[in-house]
A protein has these predicted regions:
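Substrate-binding/catalytic cleft of secreted carbohydrate-active enzymes
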Residues: 368, 377-610
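Short strand-turn-strand beta-turns centered on an Asx-Gly dipeptide
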Residues: 132-138, 241-243, 307-308, 335
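N-terminal carbohydrate-binding accessory modules
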Residues: 213-214, 291-294, 303-370
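Extended acidic/polar, glycine-enriched regions
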Residues: 154-160, 229-325
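N-terminal pre-domain segments of enzymes
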Residues: 2-49
Length: 612
């Protein structure tokens, strides 16, 4: 172990730094009149929608009362802390952030409100939101990473309508989930952001419409299982396309219960009431199913007609499991074939947009570049990304390990991070029911996190490329990992679980998951599959492409040439020989630099790729 490198990696806050104004090529080319105009939800897509991104009025106040005047305009969906928002102002925990814009309802639309609804969607708002229309409360939402929606229909009037949003964000001053955000940025923790940070849109739907559905591909049986939640009931038509060829087209005037041994192309159960409306289930048989792989990421097109509601989606036929190889070593398997996962850690930060990518093509660039560098997996690190990022992973063929977002009150970094780095074995003897140690004294905070964890699985369940759920990372806000693993397994039986990435292993889940930045890489024998869920972290600051002069990383190099040689040597001489010994996955830190943490393969502005 290099104690000097270890000591230099101690995290320090530098909130008074003035960060360099780095921009990406997509941010430089951004047209404020056409911001992120792609349909934001590719797996439940409708035609009749309106994107509400663009300029809104905003105000930052000390009072919770709606302002009579506004401070200016903000470019949605960029948070006010970001360059692209045009505001560049940190929202404090004791402040309110207000948004306002108009919505115009035509006489024709207003006259037909008895037969249709107008649904408003927020991709994500950090952290607590109050939505009002024409001064009337529509809904509230807490949680900065998950989408929410509201039915505007009862609040509409003909002509101009005023849509407003009030936001508060405690960031790391509370137990709420916040990931890497901190009000005192520095080291491996980054600038806090707030407010709207994903696309806002609205869509007209018929009175009876599809609310959501769950898609489960049974790779072994060649079946797609659909569970659909609806408002109201109506005839259903389901179509599946393999490229342009329709391989299933079934219509139902009235739902029928499935038989135990159904021989037809599909079966649909009787609709039955549930708290969210009606529930319908279908089994679709996929003839000669074409498997999804990282080399051939084939996606089937799914079209569902529910009365007058028409939606389009997609799915893939694949399975993710952990199985023993011919030597009895547990391995990660894609479609029952062992696959070594060469992964990279992705923080999901941008210099000009912070949490918000400046364009859809920026997502594509990151994913394609990582594939070109030889990676077949991305670990999305304690952030939930916009739905289109997952769509691009699905279609481009890269596997995703999805972290839950960390939260909890303040915890001791020396005890939670530094000590386990120096003495890894010590963390295995600490139980995570010591709530105070891990910043989880608040029962309300623990319950809130559990709900968010299960809601995250609910939201991302249909994503074909997501292979593994990661509830906890390095003990940050960790608690009751054994119980949480059981809850996740009950919610989703189709994906393995990395119960505690890094340390504070409670012995559960499907992986023995280790972080190793300062010791010689090795394999730890365990009954579970062994993964290096973080390693590397080599730092190389590129002049003109870094946020600050300061360097944070785990081993420092002065030039791209030095970095490249060390990086290749790490992969070829230390990492690859471990695969035969039992290593089944490894996650290199990281995809890009973030602020002073310059251990990315790409610079923060994505303009320089360091490996040569």
């Amino acid at each position: 172990m290099d104690l000097f490198d270890c000591a230099r990696s101690i995290n320090k806050s530098h909130e008074n730094d003035v960060l360099a104004r780095l921009t990406t090529v997509w941010g430089e080319e951004l047209d404020p009149e056409h911001v992120l105009e792609e349909y934001p939800r590719p797996q439940l897509k409708r035609d009749n929608f309106t994107i509400l991104n663009g300029y809104w009025r905003y105000a930052i106040t000390r009072s919770g009362d709606m302002p009579t005047t506004y401070d200016g305009t903000i470019l949605v969906p960029f948070s006010p802390e970001s360059i692209l928002s045009g505001v560049e102002r940190q929202l404090q925990p004791d402040e309110y952030l207000w948004y306002e814009r108009g919505i115009f309802i035509t006489a024709e639309d207003y006259a037909s409100l008895s037969s249709k609804k107008l649904i408003l969607h927020f991709g994500a708002v950090d952290q607590t939101a109050l939505v009002c229309l024409n001064g009337r409360k529509v809904c509230t939402h807490t949680g900065g990473y998950l989408p929410f929606e509201a039915d505007l229909t009862p609040f509409l009037r003909e002509g101009c309508n005023s849509l407003s949003l009030r936001v508060r964000d405690a960031s790391d001053a509370s137990y709420h989930s916040r990931g890497k955000q901190t009000l005192k940025r520095g080291g491996m923790f980054y600038t806090a952001q707030s407010g709207i940070w994903q696309t806002v849109w609205m869509e007209w739907v018929p009175k009876n419409y599809i609310r959501k559905f769950y898609l489960t591909s049974d790779y072994d049986k060649g079946e797609l299982h659909i569970r659909m939640l609806t408002h109201g009931t109506a005839p259903v038509r389901i179509q599946v396309f393999e490229e342009s060829n329709c391989i299933c087209d079934d219509s139902y005037k009235e739902p029928v219960p499935p038989k135990k041994k159904e021989s037809s192309a599909s079966a649909l159960s009787a609709a039955k009431r549930n708290p969210e409306g009606y529930s319908l289930s279908a089994i679709i048989r996929i003839p000669k199913a074409r498997p999804w792989t990282t080399e051939d990421p084939f996606l089937y097109t799914l079209k569902i007609q529910f009365g007058d509601d028409h939606v389009e989606s997609y799915f893939a036929m694949r399975s993710f499991t952990v199985e023993p190889d011919e030597k009895g070593i547990p391995r990660f398997c894609l479609n029952h074939s062992p696959l070594f996962l060469h992964g990279v850690l992705d923080q999901g930060y941008w210099p000009d947009g912070l949490y918000t990518a400046p364009s859809d093509q920026a997502f594509v660039y990151d994913i394609r570049t990582m594939k070109e560098l030889g990676f077949n997996m991305i670990r999305k690190h304690i952030k939930i990304e916009a739905a289109r990022w997952y769509y691009h992973c699905d279609r481009l063929g890269i596997i995703v390990w999805q972290d839950m977002v960390s939260g909890g009150s303040s915890y001791s970094l020396p005890l939670v991070c530094y000590l386990p780095t120096l003495i890894p074995d010590i963390s295995g003897h600490l139980k995570d029911n010591n709530y105070k140690l891990f910043g989880r004294s608040s029962k309300k905070g623990r319950n809130e996190w559990i709900k968010e964890c299960l809601d995250t699985i609910d939201y991302l369940y249909n994503v074909p490329s997501i292979a593994v759920w990661v509830p906890f990372n390095e003990g940050w806000g960790q608690f009751d990992a054994g119980r949480i693993t059981k809850l996740i397994r009950k919610k989703d039986k189709t994906r393995p679980i990395d119960q505690a990435s890094g340390w504070f292993d409670q012995g559960g889940g499907d992986f023995k998951s280790v972080h190793n930045y300062f010791r010689k890489l090795d394999v730890v024998k365990d009954h579970r599959a062994f993964v290096l869920s973080e390693y590397g972290g080599y730092a190389c600051r590129i002049e003109g492409h870094s946020s600050v002069e300061r360097i944070y990383g785990y081993k420092k190099f002065s030039t791209k040439e030095e970095f490249s040689k060390a990086y290749r040597r790490l992969l070829d001489t230390e990492l690859k020989p471990l695969i035969e010994k039992g290593l089944c996955a490894a996650v290199y830190t990281q995809l890009s630099d973030v602020e002073e943490e310059v251990n990315g393969l790409l610079t923060y502005d994505r303009k320089v790729c360091k490996p040569q």
